[in-house]
Amino acid sequence: MKTDTSTFLAQQIVRLRRRDQIRRLMQRDKTPLAILFMAAVVGTLTGLVGVAFEKAVSWVQNMRIGALVQVADHAFLLWPLAFILSALLAMVGYFLVRKFAPEAGGSGIPEIEGALEELRPVRWWRVLPVKFIGGMGTLGAGMVLGREGPTVQIGGNLGRMVLDVFRMRSAEARHTLLATGAAAGLSAAFNAPLAGILFIIEEMRPQFRYNLISIKAVFTGVIMSSIVFRIFNGEAPIIEVGKLSDAPVNTLWLYLILGIIFGCVGPVFNSLVLRTQDMFQRFHGGEIKKWVLMGGAIGGLCGILGLIEPEAAGGGFNLIPIAAAGNFSVGLLLFIFIARVVTTLLCFSSGAPGGIFAPMLALGTLLGTAFGMAAAVLFPQYHLEAGTFAIAGMGALMAASVRAPLTGIVLVLEMTDNYQLILPMIITCLGATLLAQFLGGKPLYSTILARTLAKQDAEQAAKSQNAPAGENT
């Protein structure tokens, strides 16, 4: 009898200990399942919309090119039609942005950063259709823009939409789902889940509230977005450059030199972007007609440029494998680099709905390949492969300009599937980042956000000054 009683007591003690352990575990992990569920919904929606946006842009581009092919034998029709089609498509994007959702202009990433700090509004019912349709117009016109900016902003706005639909009122949920959508958007644009996570942690580090709940939600959203992307597009890397050879240790100093070059180029590029933005602002002065006509002219010129020098137009994804393969001479690579710098400045700084990641990756590829080809001639004993410098250059310009070296490294490695180049990439991107910081360069997105907030404050101050006068009349 005593044995049965002691056995019963022992079993009860074990059960109580298990319950206590479970209770402690539940107290330790306070992640609300509702937020994780909504993060999965946000990631799935962002993946679906991101894939739809990519397909829609490709459809518009194919329709435009197909129309040009029909009149390819008639030069007197081909050139005007190339200008008109691209101009009309671009004007659609500029008009929608200016008329209905000014915050949908440009990349959209600074807007998400501002929204994470509760400094910028998130009007998803306006931004989602304007960014999607406007991006179809500008990117479909062949302008030098990327789709990553739109998908990041679309993802963030989808996060806020889901929050409103489920009527979540907590500030933590609002912040977390916005960041989750942005990370899922980058992942959906580049098929780069780890880069999407790092982008939020690194690039948006001043705004992102890193805690157990938010990081789990970001992971969940990125996973769902990546799964959706791969269901529709497969698992192949989006930039096919083939498997490149590893960089020997005795050649790593060349990658540091390349990083120094990009450390000088990055701040200059950022300065040119801001100066070009000011130039366009002085030109149109906020008038919608001037702004739309200006956008149409830029879009039309990109359409013409696509006939003359196709490599100088478009986002750049098609150019990267060709340039990295060494199909161009050093002189031609530098010429295309300069041409694309000009077109990137015109397209992005004018406020067109579109990103700058893809154009920067193409610019980095061009300059990196040119450096690699020149180094191969100067140092034949190393048996250098120019493609490895192209890969390093892709991330270096982004690291120097955006000041997000980890994101640049991981993004390029995921996009190209050349993980063996991680060491030369670290050397190049770190050198570019440190020198850009030493030269006083400011991160591009943070600077654009600061200018946007300054403009917002000036407009609010002007309204407050005019309010008494309006009330007295």
Curated annotation (Swiss-Prot):
InterPro entries: Cl-channel_ClcA (IPR023861), Cl-channel_core (IPR014743), ClC (IPR001807). This is H(+)/Cl(-) exchange transporter ClcA. Homodimer. A motif (Selectivity filter part_3) lies at residues 355-359. Residues 109-116, 177-189, 193-201, 387-401, 402-404, 405-416, 417-421 dip into the membrane without crossing it. One of its GO terms (molecular function) is voltage-gated chloride channel activity. It is a multi-pass membrane protein. A motif (Selectivity filter part_2) lies at residues 146-150. Chloride binds at residues 107, 356-357, 445. NCBIfam families: PRK05277.1. It catalyses: 2 chloride(in) + H(+)(out) = 2 chloride(out) + H(+)(in). Residues 1-32, 117-123, 167-176, 202-214, 282-287, 439-473 are cytoplasmic. Its main location: membrane. GO terms for cellular component: plasma membrane. Proton-coupled chloride transporter. Functions as antiport system and exchanges two chloride ions for 1 proton. Probably acts as an electrical shunt for an outwardly-directed proton pump that is linked to amino acid decarboxylation, as part of the extreme acid resistance (XAR) response. It is found in: Cell inner membrane. Keywords: Antiport, Cell inner membrane, Cell membrane, Chloride, Ion transport, Membrane, Transmembrane, Transmembrane helix, Transport. The gene is clcA. Residues 70-76, 233-252, 310-329, 377-386 are periplasmic. The record marks 148 as: Mediates proton transfer from the outer aqueous phase to the interior of the protein. A motif (Selectivity filter part_1) lies at residues 106-110.
